[in-house]
Curated annotation (Swiss-Prot):
G1: region residues: 19-26
Organism expressing this protein natively: Guillardia theta (Cryptophyte)
Family: Belongs to the TRAFAC class translation factor GTPase superfamily. Classic translation factor GTPase family. EF-Tu/EF-1A subfamily.
Reactions that this protein is recorded to catalyse: GTP + H2O = GDP + phosphate + H(+)
Region (G5): 173-175
InterPro entries from the UniProt entry: EF-Tu_GTP-bd, EF-Tu_GTPase, EFTu-like_2, EFTU_2, G_TR_CS, P-loop_NTPase, Small_GTP-bd, T_Tr_GTP-bd_dom
Record region (G4): 135-138
GO terms for MF: GTP binding; GTPase activity; translation elongation factor activity
Record function comment: GTP hydrolase that promotes the GTP-dependent binding of aminoacyl-tRNA to the A-site of ribosomes during protein biosynthesis.
Binding site for GTP: 19-26, 80-84, 135-138
Protein name (database record): Elongation factor Tu, chloroplastic
EC numbers, comma separated: 3.6.5.3
Region described as G3: spans on this chain: 80-83
SUPFAM superfamilies in alphabetical order: EF-Tu/eEF-1alpha/eIF2-gamma C-terminal domain (SSF50465), P-loop containing nucleoside triphosphate hydrolases (SSF52540), Translation proteins (SSF50447)
Length: 408
């Protein structure tokens, strides 16, 4: 069974389908899975994807279906959410961080409200690359109409700062491709024009989405979860390394809650054993030089010097939980003071102002709303654009958000 090893050697890419309801996102997911199943020998059917199981991410229940498939180049983990609210929640909580997305737009209808909304969301939560699939092309006899829809989608993408003219477009029919594969499971490339459009789409995705940067290649960062002092050796901060790598002897910064300080790593421990280097994903204890136990606390981060700065004011995109999801039962107003749970700690902050997601001003925020808000924290903490946070009140999560802009 040498085959399993081969699968793991390909880079993993996280991808998802976005677009207006009923434009064929789930059908396309099923068509890709079926068409590429000759690589893996397994595919997921439409109804398996559509009746997605519930998952919990940051205290919010999300229905997401995970489908895996591979091309010659990459191994894909694909997320499809059946409900529109699930998309919003999935993208904001980062339950699945996407390296790229396939925007599905019906060639027969053109862009619709959720097409715009998903492009906007993709921009706000930092989906870096989009490839477009114009679905239901079998219903459009006129080439010019197809070109018109493509132009409309390009303009929409450019409006939200995606490079519309560079983004690859493929027109096809997910349904007809799916039917062709169902009727002839051994169908090869070149034997059916609709199945070929699925191959063309995946070629474009392979080419256009670059290999994701591995977490270990990024600047080192670890959120402090706990602090101990070891007699005769000094202070140890423990936590899980979020990204990057770190070695004994490296200089690092302690950021957040107080003045930023520099220190040197004098030891690394994992599972009671010492190690020379720790990588992203490791749960470690970091021994730091010249730092008292009282100088460092949960909620601070240890980071590569200059890689992250403390802030108190930021803008964020927030999904407010419904009562059924365990959120608030009543609306809140400007001046609301909840706790913001960032990485490992709660910091009190004020929600100064907010607008609803379409940019109109909102007087109050109802459970289930999606808003843009400005938050002012009482202590500076290490935050950066694209970072996830939860809003909590009395220990329960009332909202989930992503930082869209740092103000100060």
């Amino acid at each position: 069974m040498a085959r399993d090893k081969f699968e793991r050697s390909k880079p993993h890419v996280n991808i998802g389908t976005i677009g207006h309801v009923d434009h064929g996102k789930t059908t396309l997911t099923a068509a890709i899975s079926a068409t590429l199943s000759q690589y893996t020998g397994k595919s997921k059917k439409f109804d398996e994807i559509d009746s997605a199981p519930e998952e919990r991410a940051r205290g919010i229940t999300i229905n997401t279906a995970h489908v895996e498939y591979e091309t010659d180049k990459w191994y894909y983990a694909h997320v499809d959410c059946p409900g529109h609210a699930d998309y919003v929640k999935n993208m904001i909580t980062g339950a699945a961080q996407m390296d790229g997305a396939i925007l599905v737009c019906s060639a027969a209808n053109g862009p619709m409200p959720q097409t715009r909304e998903h492009i906007l969301l993709a921009k706000q939560v930092g989906v870096p690359y989009i490839v477009v699939f114009l679905n239901k092309a079998d219903m459009v006899d006129d080439e010019e109409l197809l070109e018109l829809v493509q132009l409309e989608v390009q303009e929409l993408l450019e409006k939200y700062d995606f490079p519309g003219s560079e983004i690859p477009f493929v027109a096809g029919s997910a349904l007809l491709a799916l039917e062709a594969v169902a009727n002839n499971p051994t169908i090869k490339r070149g034997e059916d024009k609709w199945v070929d459009t699925i191959y063309q789409l995946m070629d474009k995705v392979d080419e256009y989405i670059p290999t994701p940067e591995r977490e270990t290649d990024k600047a080192f960062l670890m959120a402090v979860e706990d602090v101990f002092s070891i007699t005769g050796r000094g202070t140890v901060a423990t936590g899980r390394i979020e990204r990057g790598k770190v070695k004994v002897g490296d200089t690092i910064e302690i950021v957040g809650l107080r003045e930023t300080r520099n220190t040197t790593i004098t030891g690394l421990e994992m599972f009671q054993k010492s190690l020379d280097e720790a990588l992203a994903g490791d749960n470690v204890g970091i021994l730091v030089r010249g730092i008292q136990k009282t100088d460092i606390e949960r909620g601070m981060v240890l980071a590569a010097p200059g890689s992250i700065t403390p802030h108190t004011k930021f803008e964020g995109e927030v999904y407010v939980l419904t009562k059924e999801e365990g959120g608030r039962h009543t609306p809140f107003f400007s001046g609301y003071r909840p706790q913001f749970y960032v990485r490992t700690t709660d910091v009190t902050g004020t929600i100064a102002q907010f607008t609803s997601d379409d940019g109109s001003t909102a007087e109050m925020v109802m459970p289930g709303d999606r808003i843009k808000m400005t938050a002012q924290l009482i202590h500076p903490i290490a935050i950066e654009k694209g970072m996830r946070f939860a809003i909590r009140e009395g220990g329960r999560t009332v909202g989930a958000g992503v930082v869209s802009k740092i103000i100060e």
